[in-house]
């Protein structure tokens, strides 16, 4: 433990040492201020969710090379159960948690049950099954030590059910270890904020909030990861991250601005890796905000679509790192809309505002993450909206604070991303186009958009088994949100990551924001 503390201190004390990173350790510079918890039942931020993929395993996963396909992970195979709304899973007989405890069907049942009962941010994904506190106990049947039957009451097919089980919230935790660390019936949630109990390639060795996260190779993992240790170094400033990667003080650097990426492309000691991403970026209005009723006026939503200078954002400000995208399904997903019906048109926006009774000088606050590209985009939005005499007050905050504000509806407007939790159109439709009384606190709930009819259509699309009909339903859902909603989808990103040349075998999934650490070599 002393050596690990020393390791954290080494990269936390000074940037002037310029020491080469250890051969058995990957050092990554990335902001860590968005992390709230490492409990897979609660984690819902990009960095912590991406860490989940390296420390926990699900029954199945999206294939790393072809994410439209499914690959076995903790389950060696699966088949239909006793009804069309059930599946039988057979577990790997030799899988073990980092504690040495074997992975059993009881761990699977415990993990999914606790996620439903904790009812944290990502629990709405499992709610797609129709699972509730009241019925979850009756949804599983143990067939033998390595086989269980899972069922669900919701009208969804087996393919969507499998996709839901690839999300981090469906990760399998070590029930014995977690229960040993439970306090006041919290299912071990408090302990898992800063610890891990998984069967993935790595385990959490040490975490210092906002400063460093140390992952150590899980000695029980099979196969073993190529490196012994991963150090995520919390570096809040993008300029400092660029300096660290140039000096060789870190091996990988994330969240660099367009100008920094351009400059690093000329450095012969490193390269820029580009990975496809499912992240879509949107402007959202809190329609329930009492201080500014204009936010609930559809005229403002409509005008906003014509006050975003999409071309300038994508090509000039962000230098092509982000493409124009105006629908909630990301490019690459089945049925994603590729059209771009909106462009920058101040005169049209003014006309819409006037007809809708939005007075000149209308003002609202825009909450954004205090990192690129959010600050840059927010300033551009502030300037473009001002041309129509709509005043935006910028409120940059740490990422963790932004998520807390969103979940508490404590904001007026927001510019942020949404990433797919699994590779299926339902992952984004259930966020942008679903909000029912007493239901999950989706994105539509967070902006206070009451949509009973649209929510019903979202459920219909989720349960449709005919591929062509399902695609048509998602097209209609996208068009509705695209044309008339408090969401203005603007961009889709591609992950551009600076990597030192001595680092190889780097790969990143479409739905995550960090590398798969188990394959990385130095």
In which residue ranges do the predicted regions lie?
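Ligand-site clamp/hinge motif
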Residues: 190, 218-263, 391-393
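Gly/Pro-rich hinge or "lid" segments in bacterial periplasmic/extracellular proteins
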Residues: 64, 166-225, 347, 351
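Append "and occasionally in soluble cytosolic enzymes with long acidic Gly/Pro-rich linkers
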Residues: 214-221, 296-383, 387-388, 448-450, ...
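Long beta-strand-rich cores associated with HINT superfamily self-processing modules
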Residues: 497-522
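N-terminal lobe/hinge region of extracytoplasmic solute-binding protein
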Residues: 29-82, 113, 195-199
